[in-house]
Design a protein with these regions (language model features):
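Metal-dependent nuclease catalytic regions and adjoining charged, substrate-binding loops involved
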Residues: 20-21, 124-202
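Short amphipathic alpha-helical segments and their helix-coil junctions
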Residues: 27-33, 95-99, 167-173
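Generic recognition of stable, solvent-exposed alpha-helical segments in well-folded globular domains
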Residues: 1-5, 17, 21, 43-50, ...
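Non-catalytic protein-protein interaction segments used by genome-maintenance enzymes to assemble
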Residues: 68-127
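A non-catalytic, helix-rich entry segment at domain boundaries
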Residues: 2-72, 76
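Secondary-structure transition/capping motifs at alpha-helix termini
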Residues: 13, 61-62, 92-95, 126-133
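Glycine- and acidic
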Residues: 10, 32-38, 98-105, 152
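Metal-dependent nuclease catalytic cores in nucleic-acid-processing enzymes
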Residues: 5-11, 107-142
């Protein structure tokens, strides 16, 4: 994802947080040859510029103290190998903060995010002293959201126990070859919707 790469470089560079800086990185990361239609490329570039300008405006008010970006991790959870990548980890006076960037149009509550819960589970057990411990906050940052881009939640031990149970339950289902369909808006772009999905059988 180009936006994720731009933000990784942006927070890894030294100096003040500026609009010119982030747009220069966008230009360097943008790969024009990967788009089939020029009109589509222009529209996507326009949207990227708008999102990043707004991000800078929001971020420069209280620049984060970034500990790490694009952190690849893995750990074992009750015999299940969990692998993932955390977009950004900040340090604040009250503890660490996990941030996950979203470019989707639909905003969702952070407290319902299994993804953020997994990040918190990893940090709870990591031996890296600067990162260890349940994050003070875990945040979904919706880059398209003009009104409230940040949706945050503090995961408790009870929350994490529930997420652990959910993950192990899914793993048991996969091992038993049980794949119950779960219909929703994500079905709109699923190739199996009209082919072999029992949830959409007429």
């Amino acid at each position: 994802n180009i936006i994720h790469k731009v933000l990784e470089r942006f927070h890894g560079s030294e100096g003040d947080i500026t609009e010119d800086q982030i747009l220069q990185i966008l230009d360097e990361e943008w790969k024009s040859g990967e788009f089939t239609y020029m009109q589509r490329e222009e529209k996507l570039k326009e949207q990227a510029v708008e999102m990043l300008k707004r991000y800078v405006d929001n971020t420069k008010q209280e620049p984060p103290h970034v500990l790490d970006t694009e952190l690849i991790f893995s750990f074992d959870l009750d015999g299940i190998r969990i692998v993932g990548m955390i977009d950004r980890i900040d340090n604040s006076p009250n503890g660490n903060k996990v941030v996950d960037y979203k470019t989707s149009k639909r905003s969702t509550p952070a407290k319902n995010s299994v993804q953020l819960g997994i990040y918190s589970l990893y940090l709870q057990q990591t031996e890296d002293e600067k990162l260890a411990g349940i994050p003070e906050t875990a945040t979904l940052y919706f880059l398209r959201d003009k009104e409230q881009p940040e949706h945050s939640h503090t995961f408790t031990e009870t929350d994490l126990d529930s997420i652990r149970e959910k993950i192990t339950g899914v793993a048991r289902g996969i091992r038993a070859r049980r794949f119950a369909p779960c219909s929703g808006y994500h079905c709109d772009w699923c190739d199996y919707k009209n082919l072999a999905c029992p949830a959409w059988e007429s």
